[in-house]
């Protein structure tokens, strides 16, 4: 588990949800009939929350006011297992609170309560003492700057210098015009508007984007400069050349907090030794998850994997499949296998299995599972491609990949009406049969097997 220190501005996000169908008689403004209220962790706390969702250990460092919102805020952080020992109380300010008013799932107004004054000398010293104490323990640092007074120029540069001295990855989500504040950071994540504002450049072409990123690299010594481009994805430099990693999002409901998700997922990806390109693809997938939800949403590893791996709508993780089948009344048939080098025998077997019920679910052994069962030279075809081929068959309704050696957990969760296995299981125990109403054995098709196909290919190559 990676340990990440997040330093920055803490924001309480408050939402009023409802419907608006009339104007106020007092002024030409809409009247919201509130149906629901919710509170989320915002700013640097949302970055921390995203990291928790991605299975990291998080130390959060920032400031709240000496007020009820601040107390509730810290309680919410603790409930998410975020370490709050680096959060200080400032008696001279209120906890930053952003209230968003949502009507018919559209944000119609926002009300901000905040004080953006710089921290006093004592608070700055206490924050820096905490960071200095933690720096050797953690794997990376994120500076989440919302320009609310915590990350002034001097403190930001001191933290970056400290991180570099201890060879720690340090990423910054910047604000304001002066990017010298973030000089020598490992990576910064401005959006197009922020970067245009800071560099006084219009970023409307390949050449202008490349020039802007070169300035970040050469003038500000940012090791890995990039820019987020909303629906156009993320652009970065690779050996001096501009690379664009396109967005993955299909439906956008709310972009609130998407930048926090991007920097959190980039940090963890890079700490896992991913290339910058792969890290950007991972971050794009995480962002695609959160913009498809309302509010400062989170992306789980399972949801990100679904975005990255799903090349067919029939391919689902178990959690999503169970959700899809929650109110199902049709007869479910389940079978499983490696289905390496899909052949006529497989297709015939699956068609017969589907004929036994209404919905056919195929449990597919992952690459790691196949390797354990059949040896290091298998599978021939990757799990992603095997899943796609199976999902392309009209007789198959859903494909779910499992990592274990057996599908016992899938069968126990799905509780199919009929469990189908190959006829070679005659007089053998069928794993998971106790969780199905009925177990049926079925021929694959005489003369067809993946092993036979592999041997035939070998003989042909040798000839």
UniProtKB/Swiss-Prot annotation:
Keyword Transferase appears in the UniProt entry: yes
How is this protein annotated for GO cellular component? cytosol
Keywords assigned by UniProt, alphabetized: ATP-binding, Carbohydrate metabolism, Kinase, Multifunctional enzyme, Nucleotide-binding, Nucleotidyltransferase, Transferase
Q: Which Gene3D superfamilies match?
A: 3.40.1190.20, HUPs
Active site as annotated? 260
Q: Which residues bind ATP?
A: 191-194
One of the GO BP terms on file: ADP-L-glycero-beta-D-manno-heptose biosynthetic process
Q: Report residue spans for region: Ribokinase.
A: 1-311
* Quaternary structure note: Homodimer.
User: What is the protein's known function?
Assistant: Catalyzes the ADP transfer from ATP to D-glycero-beta-D-manno-heptose 1-phosphate, yielding ADP-D-glycero-beta-D-manno-heptose.
Q: Which family does it belong to?
A: In the N-terminal section; belongs to the carbohydrate kinase PfkB family. In the C-terminal section; belongs to the cytidylyltransferase family.
- According to UniProt, the name of this protein is Bifunctional protein HldE
Organism per entry: Helicobacter pylori (strain G27)
């Amino acid at each position: 588990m990676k340990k990440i220190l997040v330093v920055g501005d803490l924001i309480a996000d408050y939402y009023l949800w409802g419907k608006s169908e009339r104007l106020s008689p007092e002024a030409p403004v809409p009247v919201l009939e509130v149906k629901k209220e919710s509170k989320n962790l915002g700013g640097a706390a949302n970055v921390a929350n995203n990291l928790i969702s991605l299975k990291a250990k998080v130390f959060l460092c920032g400031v709240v006011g000496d007020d009820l919102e601040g107390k509730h805020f810290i309680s919410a952080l603790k409930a998410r297992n975020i370490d709050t020992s680096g959060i200080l109380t400032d008696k001279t300010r209120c906890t930053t609170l952003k209230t968003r008013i949502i009507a018919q799932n559209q944000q119609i107004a926002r009300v901000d309560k905040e004080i953006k004054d710089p921290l006093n000398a004592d608070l700055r010293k206490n924050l820096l003492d905490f960071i200095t104490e933690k720096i050797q323990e953690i794997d990376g640092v994120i500076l989440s700057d919302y320009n609310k007074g915590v990350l002034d120029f001097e403190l930001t540069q001191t933290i970056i210098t400290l991180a570099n001295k201890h060879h720690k990855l340090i990423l910054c989500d910047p604000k304001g015009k002066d990017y010298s504040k973030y000089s020598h950071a490992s990576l910064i994540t401005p959006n197009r508007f922020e970067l245009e504002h800071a560099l006084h450049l219009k970023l409307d072409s390949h050449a202008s984007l490349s020039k802007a990123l070169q300035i970040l690299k050469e003038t500000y010594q940012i090791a890995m400069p990039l820019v987020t481009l909303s629906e156009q994805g993320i652009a970065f430099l690779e050996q001096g050349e501009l690379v664009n990693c396109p967005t993955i999002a299909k439906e956008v409901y709310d972009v609130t907090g998407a930048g926090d998700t991007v920097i959190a997922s980039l940090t963890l990806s890079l700490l896992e030794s991913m290339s910058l390109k792969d890290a950007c693809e991972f971050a794009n997938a995480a962002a695609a998850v959160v913009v498809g939800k309302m509010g400062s949403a989170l992306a789980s590893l399972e949801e990100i994997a679904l975005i990255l791996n799903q090349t067919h709508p029939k391919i689902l993780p178990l959690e999503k499949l169970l959700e899809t089948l929650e109110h199902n009344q049709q007869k479910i048939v389940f079978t499983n296998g490696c289905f390496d080098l899909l052949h006529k025998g497989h297709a015939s077997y699956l068609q017969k299995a589907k004929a036994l019920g209404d919905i056919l679910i195929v449990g597919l052994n992952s690459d790691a599972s196949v390797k354990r069962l059949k040896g290091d030279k298998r599978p021939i075809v990757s799990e992603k491609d095997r899943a796609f081929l199976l999902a392309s068959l009209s007789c198959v309704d859903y494909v779910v990949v499992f990592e274990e050696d057996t599908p016992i957990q899938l069968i126990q969760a799905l509780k199919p009406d009929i469990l189908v296995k190959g006829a070679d299981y005659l007089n053998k125990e069928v794993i998971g049969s106790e969780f199905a109403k009925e177990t049926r054995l079925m021929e694959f098709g005489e003369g067809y097997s993946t092993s036979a196909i592999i041997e035939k290919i070998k003989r042909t190559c040798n000839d």
